[in-house]
């Protein structure tokens, strides 16, 4: 009998909506990067992935307010001392239960960079065949600046964050922290009793309603594109 394992508390950390959001975002971001680099007819799918990412971002912002305990922004750890403690391999147990200090900063960075990338994409124009759905609502100067950011700065920032995220997962796996597994089944074995995220049918129904509203809102934004 593994006495250490018998003293661990299996706790629901990531509710199903958060897990589905995470993996849907992974697929959508990879799709964005790949189709954006291919160009040409693949840009049709680039726009579709962009629409999906916009809906997912809106969902995450709302779910960060009403979602499971560890998915809420109020439980993110962004204190500088917590960041320093994690870098030194220290910190309280609760700092590694949900998103750690560095993990919290990574989520915030991802959301901000993706918002900037999607936002700039909405008003970008490749000057060949494809233009964002909102380019007709802003000046040509804004379109030019947004296009430059979207194709150069934003894309590199996004790819850089993705690579850092992958390296962080590898590092945590080496340290014995199964981050990927927890984001699949939702649970973590904890040495101390910690609050569990609610993940019942009520929370999942609420998430479904929020997601439908976000999908509708994203579709509406993209429907503003002029028709010729």
Task: Give each language-model segment a name.
Residues 1-228:
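Membrane-embedded alpha-helical bundles that constitute the cytochrome b-like, heme-associated redox core
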């Amino acid at each position: 009998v593994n006495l250490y394992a018998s003293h661990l508390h299996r706790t629901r950390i990531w509710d199903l909506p958060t897990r589905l959001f995470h993996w849907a975002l992974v697929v959508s971001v990879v799709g964005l990067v790949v189709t954006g680099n291919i160009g040409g007819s693949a840009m049709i799918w680039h726009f579709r992935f962009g629409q999906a990412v916009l809906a997912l971002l809106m969902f995450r912002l709302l779910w960060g307010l009403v979602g499971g305990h560890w998915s809420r922004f109020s439980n993110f750890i962004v204190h500088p001392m917590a960041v320093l403690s994690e870098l030194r391999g220290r910190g309280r147990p609760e700092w590694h239960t949900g998103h750690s200090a560095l993990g919290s900063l990574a989520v915030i960075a991802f959301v901000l960079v993706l918002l900037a990338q999607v936002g700039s994409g909405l008003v970008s124009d490749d000057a060949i065949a494809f233009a964002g759905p909102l380019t007709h609502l802003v000046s040509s100067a804004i379109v030019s600046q947004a296009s430059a950011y979207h194709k150069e700065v934003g894309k590199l920032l996004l790819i850089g964050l993705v690579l850092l995220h992958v390296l962080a997962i590898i590092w945590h796996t080496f340290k014995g922290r199964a981050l990927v597994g927890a984001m699949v089944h939702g649970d973590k074995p904890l040495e101390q009793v910690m609050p569990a995220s609610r993940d019942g049918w009520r929370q999942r129904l609420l998430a479904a309603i929020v997601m439908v509203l976000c999908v509708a809102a994203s579709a509406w934004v993209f429907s503003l594109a002029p028709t010729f």
